[in-house]
């Protein structure tokens, strides 16, 4: 008997070992799409020169149904084509020889959703490489008016408006990873070029097929100056203030206030002066700012820029310099601005000799543009990003055998079971070591940036040299790979803050930028004394009843100063001029709302309150019932019916939703394809794929945390909440309950519905997912998704924006879709609980009609769209605003496919009522879950026991507020 068991054991081990080894052949062969770097290497021998062909847009060979001819108001392109968000246009072109060609597109940005225009470029019916699927065309922005001054003496930045104009741009990588434009292989003879829409409409005027040549060096241009007899000018100095920029590629590049330096122009020690531009908002490669200036005479000028790059310690930021739309010579491709804690005058010239590069300017008006580029760091970033992708693959392959927490004393024979592992580790150690050396040569020092690379290189070398130590080094390997991802993000960022630009004759001494000791001391003293008298909670204009002959509304907002300033600007632009109602906006911690209200010092309107607060205040007579206003039904139609549920009780509504968030299913396309797995449609499908993931030591992610805890761009931060969704993984339980067609409460909340068979089944399924299928309770969703340990997970849809910004190396490798559902009567029910903050009117409001006008204005489509666009323009795509206004969502910068998915999931949304005693529901559902998971107690009995406690508390609270209670 023992011999038979031993024989079976040997067979099982042999088969298991064979399967592992057999499934890992050629595992480090790149599976992702071809990138431009490798594409360029493939066709580098086919470079062309001196070629240019213009293709009018109207000569296309194919156009989808939505494409139409466009009447050009400027009369420049009479054969232009309008293309919508889901259109395709294709042209046939003939070239005389095989080769690599650049493509320039002349386009006109028509009104859309204020985001950049995205297209894919197909050559002969195929996407040539990954970057061709993410081509961006910038809109052009400028100030919507002059700088205004509020009644406190602070300057108010003008809103950013689009400046539509014809632009011709070379097709380039949207992430700025390459220092050259993208090029495309065209075979001799006929070819097709297609533009496929991804986001935003645009008008196409023409395409150009051309071959670019390098810019001449300054030495060559200088020789041409001499040959043409150009001479330097004398005694001319022109200052261009940074804040006076006339055009920019992003609405986030607006004028800023900097009072850290007494020599900033203009300056005030306390009040806001818009005196600089750029800063950390100007970090994204590809973004540009343009100024106009005029010179009094023709001749040669020097250029200097008073700027501060105080973010990237031990490194520099780069800018491409363009005069009148052209780079004057090669040295202008990447002007470097080294790290400095204060403003420095950076001369455009030879760094070693201090000799300025002179630029010839004709008398009259000119433009100067600075474009954010990676410069010499471009190849460093590209190579590192490629290495990170392979390191993640290596880590994932190791984890498939060892798990994420291996036994450090066990020899897993990884070098045998993962063919190519050692050579891959050695290769990456060498590559990253070389990158570190290249970076050191570029920045001229061995600082923290280099140390990250050197540490990772050494770690990889040790793992390759001593494979038996890999299990105990695995956690460090994961951390180092995560640090490398952060390193890439930080290296890609190229911030720069500009005070002013100098155009001067070579004989003119440049202005001093360093304040003397007396100026610094006086500045610090004034700023310190002002802090005792200046009220920083008030935003913008502050009004009294005498100013408008009406009592101003007092509105509280509990968010960041950026959000408050956007809102105040919008109030001054539209609400007050249209209604005549003045508003004093105060930036406070919304957590003090309750004590302030009890003390009789609360606001008229509160923005960004947690979803439980309208009901908490209403039950105590402190919130206004909004249904009393005649036009409430019209206002309510702005939202999905589920959005009003948390603020409703007994036929009354005490708040309006600001944002609405819900879960989506995120997945790694590359990993699921590699494992041969389909995206699950139901929870039964999820249960089927969990073993397939587990056998490779991967997990399905189902968060043990509440939707209400995700930010998703909400305007308010709020205080601790007692929302049902704020406790543990209750959102998962509610998802399973709602998908069974049941509600959480009976009647108007007189008792819970947790005794129903559907609730017991949902609770049992919820606990079994963690108990039987061992789903992790706690995890870092972003890093585990990025590293591939958790290739499929449920997350708030705001996770999309996070991945777009913080995991650029995964571009094109992931997607999101509807959450898994429960099949009932042949239909997959994908119901999901939703949550979000609200705005409400306090009962103590002095003028409730005026407060209602403000709330209507705030939740209107126009206001929500503008606020969301302004917020994203300032804080970036990661701060995309999840407005609850349905029409506003349709105007935010999602692609057509993304928007359709979000709206389909929203159609399944169900709100969670906030009833008296509701705080006990989430708390005890979480307690019941823990009892089952940690103490192995039976699910049914545990749920029913806690349900009795919950209902007792609900009864107590309903009696307190004189409401009907459940009969004993």
Predicted regions, residues:
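Extracytoplasmic
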Residues: 20-506, 834
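Long, aromatic- and glycine/proline-rich binding clefts that accommodate carbohydrate-like moieties
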Residues: 817-821, 869-931, 959-968
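Glycine-centered hinge/linker elements that transmit conformational signals in sensory
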Residues: 748-778
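Extracytoplasmic/periplasmic substrate-recognition and gating elements
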Residues: 97, 297, 764, 806-879, ...
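Extracytoplasmic "Venus flytrap"/periplasmic binding protein-like
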Residues: 573-642, 646, 670-678, 789-792, ...
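Conserved N-terminal structural module of periplasmic/extracytoplasmic solute-binding proteins
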Residues: 22-24, 299, 383-385, 391-615, ...
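Hinge/lid segment of periplasmic solute-binding proteins
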Residues: 532, 536-549, 611-664, 685-689, ...
